[in-house]
């Protein structure tokens, strides 16, 4: 069964897609996609999904969505550009979340755009790191959203 949070990301990505070379326009579009995704997931079950969950106040970092029922964090990097840096940063957010709480997160689903993200994330180093984290009971996976053809 497909993950409804990932499905919502694909839908938000497809609906709001714009082709522009303007950096400001692309930033606004990415923000609109992320907001649409968070709203759609919240509508699925507002008691289950915590939106923009604070890791710790002193770090001023948030996890996009926390599935409180399954102990799963979701992060959506709309543009695949710079996805590797965001990927590692998001893993650190989950590790710190788990250090600061009794109720731990057991998984992270990192969602990003396929064209730019896959070449860097479907690679030996990220795969080795995900394998290592699984040995520490943190399951990390990468899901890709794509332009519908």
Region spans (language model):
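Conserved catalytic cores of phosphodiester-cleaving nucleases, focusing on short active-site segments
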Residues: 65-67, 71-80, 94
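Acidic-basic catalytic patches of nuclease active cores, encompassing PD-(D/E)XK
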Residues: 1-54
């Amino acid at each position: 069964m497909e993950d409804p949070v990932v499905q919502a990301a694909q839908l938000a990505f497809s609906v709001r897609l714009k082709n522009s070379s303007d950096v400001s326009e692309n930033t606004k579009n990415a923000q609109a996609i992320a907001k649409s995704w968070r709203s759609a997931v919240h509508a699925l079950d507002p008691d289950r999904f915590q939106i923009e969950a604070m890791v710790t106040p002193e770090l001023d970092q948030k996890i996009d969505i926390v599935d409180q029922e399954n102990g799963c964090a979701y992060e959506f990097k709309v543009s695949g550009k710079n996805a590797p840096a965001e990927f590692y940063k998001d893993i650190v957010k989950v590790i710190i979340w788990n250090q600061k709480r009794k109720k731990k997160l057991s998984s992270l689903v990192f969602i990003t755009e396929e064209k730019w993200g896959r070449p860097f994330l479907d690679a030996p180093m990220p795969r080795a790191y995900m394998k290592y984290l699984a040995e520490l009971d943190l399951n990390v996976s990468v899901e890709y959203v794509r332009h519908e053809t």
